[in-house]
């Protein structure tokens, strides 16, 4: 009986600490010190929420920079979409020899070359043709952004030098100076572009 009471008291104490005090403490710290990140890093434009800095989007308008390929369509579907994958994130995990993967990459290459005249096949950065493990990657490499500058400049009338400045402004360095690579947040870049356009669909 003595051991039972001790175990019961210990269980109650742990429930209070781990199930109440700790979660409330972490929530309080998150909401006060990291409020934006704790709430999904939501990005606003013209007073409207237009996305998250942590989640990629499928930009098809030729006036904007495109992001990485997503095997789950960035988890955005219509009710009648026959291609709905029923998964929130992930990758197809297809082998390099898989025919479906080869066909998809070929289609993406042809599409990119068509919309970016002057670019050669072997100049297309790998991250514009491959999907991330989650299918929701919001970033591309600086090289992947810069190769799109001529096309975006032509579609928007914004000078290439100005677009390169925007890319530089939205480029983040390695985490802690050593982890990962330099990256450009596609949503943030496109919002900078949208702010310079008279008519933009972003946020409308």
UniProtKB/Swiss-Prot annotation:
Q: What induces it?
A: By low potassium concentration.
Q: Where is this region: Disordered?
A: 81-100
Question: What GO cellular-component annotations does this UniProt entry give?
Answer: plasma membrane
InterPro entries documented for this protein: KdpC
UniProt subunit comment: The system is composed of three essential subunits: KdpA, KdpB and KdpC.
Checking NCBIfam families in the record gives: kdpC, PRK00315.1, PRK13995.1
Q: What is the similarity comment for this entry?
A: Belongs to the KdpC family.
Name assigned to this protein: Potassium-transporting ATPase KdpC subunit
């Amino acid at each position: 009986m003595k051991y039972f009471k001790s175990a019961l008291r210990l269980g109650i104490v742990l429930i209070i600490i781990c199930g109440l005090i700790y979660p409330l403490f972490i929530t309080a710290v998150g909401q006060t010190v990291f409020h934006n990140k704790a709430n999904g890093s939501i990005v606003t434009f013209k007073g409207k929420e237009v996305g998250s800095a942590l989640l990629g989007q499928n930009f098809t308008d030729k006036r904007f920079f495109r992001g990485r390929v997503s095997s789950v369509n960035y988890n955005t579907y219509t009710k009648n979409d026959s291609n709905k994958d029923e998964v929130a994130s992930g990758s197809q995990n297809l082998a390099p020899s898989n025919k479906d993967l080869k066909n998809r990459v070929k289609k993406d290459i042809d599409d990119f070359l068509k919309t970016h005249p002057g670019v050669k096949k072997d100049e297309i950065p790998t991250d514009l043709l491959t999907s991330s493990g989650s299918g929701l990657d919001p970033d591309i490499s600086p090289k992947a952004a810069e190769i799109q500058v001529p096309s975006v400049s032509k579609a928007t009338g914004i000078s290439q030098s100005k677009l390169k400045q925007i890319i530089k402004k939205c480029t983040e360095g390695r985490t802690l100076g050593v982890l990962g690579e330099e990256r450009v947040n596609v949503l943030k870049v496109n919002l900078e572009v949208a702010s310079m356009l008279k008519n933009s669909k972003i946020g409308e």
